Amino acid sequence: MINRRGKIKMETVYIAGGCLWGVQHFFDTVPGVQMTEAGRANGTTSSLDGPYDGYAECVKVVYDEKDTSISELMAHLFEIIDPYSLNKQGVDVGKKYRTGLYSTDPRHLEEARAFINGREDRDKIMLEVLPLTNYVRSAEEHQHHLERHPEDCSYCHIPDAVLNLSLIHI
């Protein structure tokens, strides 16, 4: 989108794909992605403290829509998740590890749903596509964690070949 001053406006979506460390690291390497931030989507509070509030671990992805699209971001997401798994990616189990795409822009949600509906396996896919109702930035220790602590890659659900390739590109 172009804003009123004729400058390119970046688009923002929130992508959940299990543990956010690997998801953030992977999306940092995707062409067209300008910035990522680890966070929590659609919980009921604005706090990082206290009991679990229904959030999904997610990565805020800011991208240039002339360089990539929601469909392309979804295709990349499907490279690193098991789309048939509900509330589980790799060894990480629980509702906070569910997969999803969240946005405040209905166009993003429509394109994500169209991507899923265009797949032959659409009836088996457990990824949720919902409006973003709340976002909380994760603590600094979780921001770009694998870049600072590559020894933690062994905890990640993303296949080694994919994760190692993204390590090379950083």
Where are these regions (language model features)?
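Flexible coil/turn and secondary-structure edge motifs
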Residues: I2-I168
